[in-house]
Design a protein with these regions (language model features):
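Positively charged, low-complexity intrinsically disordered leader regions
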Residues: 1-23
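Substrate-binding N-lobe of the ribokinase-like
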Residues: 27-87
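Short beta-strand scaffold segments in enzyme catalytic cores
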Residues: 45, 88-92, 239-243
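Conserved phosphate-binding/catalytic loop of the ribokinase/pfkB sugar-kinase fold
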Residues: 91-127
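Short beta-strands and strand-loop turn motifs
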Residues: 101-103, 130-136, 188-190
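Charged helix-capping and loop-helix junction motifs
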Residues: 115-119, 143-151, 214-217, 251-256
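Conserved phosphate/ATP/ADP-binding segment of small-molecule kinases
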Residues: 147-246
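Conserved post-catalytic alpha-helical subdomain immediately downstream of the catalytic base
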Residues: 221-222, 226-237, 245-294
Length: 294
């Protein structure tokens, strides 16, 4: 089983327009959809589609409209009650392919709810092969929340394997605390890998796009040296790199028509973890990771 912790989930609304978006004018939507979002939720959805057991832990009131959206995708849930509603992230798409995103403000999650999220994750982890901690953090949650959560999980379930996918300040806090709170796997993109090691992530990505992966491998090895067994770097069309202290593997997707990149990295993570849970080799796990992300 795979357990996901998503501290800052979202209702992802997509509005499709037949015409170009013009600020200050009235538009009629061609279509509108609402789905459950958030990095951990996306991982849980992918695991569910693979017919594998999982539990998604997240904050939400019982009557929050986000909850039935998660139930609609058949994900088993464990919620921690909060007072404020889950945020809505809105994407406006035009026929030209241009998109405009408006991300909502996350709810307030107080200290009591923060501890309950960690407790719920620890309890679910007793029967799990992996725990995934993923996404941004909502209001009221300190940037070192994942550090605290990893330490707590190591105490309650010392043999559990932990995967982390975050960015910005939470990633910087992890980087500062790897000696005491290292996850087993970190799944950054190029920019986030740069945040981890204090390098220019954009330069790492650009080099990889040109076929030079040496910088990404060297940066990932710095993370390995601090106790992270697996660094799974997703690089878009350039594929994905899996780096350990003893080896590095590259997998590239076949040419495909990109419909949407939303959740691609989360699906890649799900594919890798499912393969590992099934006892596949690292090379096979990376291959499945890229297949899921495509």
């Amino acid at each position: 089983m795979i357990v996901t912790l998503t501290p800052n989930p979202s209702i992802d609304a997509t509005i499709a327009l037949d015409s170009a978006l013009e600020p200050g004018t009235v538009h009629r939507a061609h279509s509108m959809t609402h789905v459950a979002g958030g990095k951990g939720i996306n991982v849980a959805h992918a695991v569910t589609l693979a017919n594998q057991p999982n539990i998604a832990v997240f904050p939400a009131a019982d009557n929050d409209p986000f909850v039935p959206l998660v139930r609609d995708i058949n994900v088993e849930i464990n919620t921690v009650a909060i007072d404020e509603p889950i945020r809505t992230n809105t994407t406006v798409t035009e026929q030209s392919g241009r998109t405009t995103k408006l991300n909502g403000k996350g709810p307030l999650v107080d200290k009591k709810a923060q501890q309950l999220l960690i407790d719920a994750t620890s309890a679910a982890a007793a029967d799990a092969s992996w725990v995934v901690m993923a996404g941004s953090l909502p209001n009221g949650v300190p940037s070192d929340f994942y550090v605290t959560a990893i330490k707590a999980l190591r105490e309650s379930a010392p043999n559990i394997r932990i995967a982390l996918d975050t960015s910005d300040k939470p990633m910087e806090e992890i980087a500062k605390n790897l000696s005491t709170a290292a996850p087993d796997l970190i799944k950054p993109n190029g920019l986030e890998l740069g945040q981890l090691v204090g390098e220019d992530g954009l330069a790492l990505e650009e080099a990889a796009e040109q076929g030079d992966f040496s910088g990404v491998i060297a940066a990932a090895r710095k993370v390995n040296a601090q106790g992270v067994a697996y660094v799974l770097v997703t690089l878009g069309a350039a594929g994905a790199l899996l780096v350990t202290e003893s080896g590095a593997w590259l997998a590239s997707p076949p040419p495909i028509e990109v419909v949407s990149t939303v959740g691609a990295g989360d699906s890649s993570l799900a594919g890798f973890l499912l393969a590992q849970a099934a006892g596949k080799s690292l090379a096979e796990s990376l291959q499945q990771s890229v297949a899921y992300g495509s």
